[in-house]
A protein has these predicted regions:
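Fe-S-dependent hydro-lyases/dehydratases of central metabolism
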Residues: 1-595
Length: 595
């Protein structure tokens, strides 16, 4: 029944994984006993854990390469690029469904693909040919009118949407873009917008497939993949938001949330210490050539460190061929590998108390690797101009050459390793280094839980809070026992020890608990530590699904004021758990407070 809130199931045409979440997904696929994936296409990307300071990441990559060869999955080698940028260039198709073990999978919505982020177990099930289950989302229509002025970018569009809707405004919804302004945006510009639909909490974001889509597919040598798609003339939306692109100006998300948005003009002049340009949000050809044209013949301010991370090897090669790479180097930029890098705290942590301008999608507390840093999200144009000035500056009115897209861009298909044919695949040995640990197995929930509250947290707790990333933690994504020692490390340093001493217990949370990435480690690790239930005012979609997948009860307060009556280390009791059903009620008795 295609009505908002009703359960539905979708068969997925394509899947993608990245290495920080992929090892778990393929361990789960192996545990299912699946010989060959059942999708039209499944791709395993390596773009997160590329800082090889120990054997762990390299071991994970070898596991991913060999398990892909054995089970029919295409493998994208380290250095080939960020999964969403490469998938957009090489594989995403209008009208196809895509499920990815990364929350920014909806990037492909920029080409007209229904793309959804999910936990690794859901992606493993999709690879096994099983449908993806969710509740039918409602649809918000976003009408784009007119055309952007020079110095204003598609990043400013999505920051404006975040300002209007907040980080929970998209929960249970799909964002659908339409209007005469759509045709003024290229596919990569549209993909910037759909990418950050994840920050809205949206299930997906979608643009029509039109002549600009065909233009992009021709550029990539994939014209045969084109299919025209647009909303029905009588399409009905939950609500419609109209944005006049001609009136939009450069925007900025201030610390520590992507919806803490204002105009650059309102905070212009703020001294900055670091500028990082790249990520799956803003590392396209148009983005980076714009940056190159702004800094050409000039030099980065003496107090600013500027890094640039191309989104793919294809883009990196184009920058080298057209002279942009030379312009960036001469301007003082530090050129990084085609990976996620600083966006996930994998290197380039800023100085203490730094103000870091980043073209990324998230500025959560501590995500950069420096707890005291003030990370702000801006467009590539704002970032580049500010890097020259040493302070936040609006590029509105700045004169620079607007990039012209090449007619054709070549992909290096040698950076992909094809899976073995089914008969040969049987002989492939999957390589498992010592960092590849078996999946932890939960026990069935008892009919009664009597445990203490291990931690109480507020609103908008992210998966970065629950299961931090960064260079020190990410190498252990294949080792749940080890990575569990880092759970809530920046909120409650003794959380791990407290869980061990008490045999686990409860988590109490505010609204939008678990927003952010799709990392199922934010459910797996608490499960390993004995967490039986999370009681919150509300949940983010992907994290709630991950909690269910790993046997942790996601319970929502019927009366939000009850949140105030519970404290850390209170003993709570829940009975008759076996009677639970969707929409049903359970009573929680506070033994400590006798209420």
């Amino acid at each position: 029944k295609l009505e908002p809130g009703e359960p539905i199931a979708i068969i997925m045409d394509q899947t993608l994984t990245q290495d920080a979440t992929g090892t778990m997904a393929y361990l789960q696929l192996e545990a299912m006993g699946v010989d060959q994936v059942q999708t039209e296409l499944s791709v395993s990307y390596v773009d997160h854990n590329t800082l090889q300071s120990g054997f762990e990441n390299a071991d994970d990559h070898k596991y991913l390469q060999t398990v892909a060869e054995k089970h029919g999955v295409l493998f994208s080698r380290p250095g080939n690029g960020i999964c969403h940028q490469v998938h957009l260039e090489c594989f995403a198709k209008p009208g196809k469904t895509l499920l990815g073990s990364d929350s920014h999978t909806p990037t492909a919505g920029g080409i007209g693909s229904l793309a959804i982020g999910a936990g690794g177990l859901d992606v493993a099930c999709a690879m096994a040919g099983r449908p993806f289950h969710l509740r039918m989302p409602s649809v918000i229509g976003i009408e784009l009118k007119n055309e952007l002025r020079q110095g204003v970018s598609s990043k400013d569009i999505i920051l404006k949407v975040l300002q209007l809707l907040s980080v929970k405004g998209g929960v249970g919804r799909v964002m659908e873009y339409f209007g005469d302004g759509v045709k003024t945006l290229s596919v990569p510009q549209r993909a910037t917008i759909t990418n950050m639909g994840a920050e809205l909490g949206a299930t997906s974001s979608l643009f029509p497939s039109d002549e600009r889509t065909l233009e992009f597919l021709r550029q990539q040598g994939r014209e045969e993949d084109f299919e025209a798609l647009e909303a029905d003339p009588d399409a009905q939306y939950e609500k419609v938001i109209t944005i006049d692109l001609a009136q939009l100006e450069p925007m900025i998300a201030l610390p520590h949330s992507p919806d803490h948005v204002c105009t650059v003009r309102e905070v212009e002049g703020m001294k900055i210490d670091q500028v990082c340009i790249g990520s799956c949000t803003n590392s396209s050809y148009h983005d980076l050539v714009s940056v190159g044209n702004i800094v050409k013949g000039k030099h980065v301010h003496k107090d600013v460190s500027l890094t640039v991370s191309p989104g793919s090897r294809q883009i990196f090669k184009e920058l080298a061929d057209n002279g942009t790479l030379s312009d960036l180097i001469e301007a003082g930029a530090r050129i990084l590998e085609c990976t996620c890098g600083p966006c996930i705290g994998m290197g380039q942590s800023p100085i203490t108390e730094a103000v870091s301008l980043r073209t990324f999608n998230r500025n959560f507390y501590g995500r950069s690797g420096t707890l005291s840093a003030k990370v702000c999200l801006v467009s590539p144009e704002t970032a580049a101009y500010s890097a020259l000035c040493g302070e936040l500056r609006s590029p509105l009115g700045l004169t620079y050459e607007v990039p012209k897209e090449p007619a054709f861009m070549k992909s290096d298909r040698a950076m992909f390793i094809a899976p073995k044919p089914a008969e040969e695949a049987k002989d492939v040995t999957v390589v498992r280094g010592p960092n590849i640990r078996p999946l932890p197995v939960n026990t069935p929930l008892p009919d009664m839980i009597d445990k203490k509250v291990m931690i109480k947290v507020g609103d908008n707790i992210t998966t970065d809070h629950i299961a931090p990333a960064g260079a020190k933690v990410l190498p252990y994504r294949s080792n749940i026992e080890k990575i569990s020692t880092f759970v809530f490390m920046n909120n409650k340093a003794d959380f791990h020890d407290c869980c061990k001493e008490n045999g686990g217990g409860f988590i109490i949370a505010g609204a939008n608990y678990g927003q952010g990435s799709s990392r199922e480690h934010a459910a797996l690790s608490p499960m390993y530590l004995g967490i039986k239930a999370v009681i919150a005012k509300s949940f983010a979609r992907i994290h709630k699904a991950n909690l269910i997948n790993f046997g942790i009860l996601p319970l929502t307060f019927t009366d939000e004021s009850d949140y105030e009556t519970i404290d850390e280390m209170d003993e709570l009791r829940i009975e008759e758990i076996g009677s639970i059903h969707p929409g049903g009620k359970l009573s929680v008795y506070n033994v400590t407070k006798d209420c």
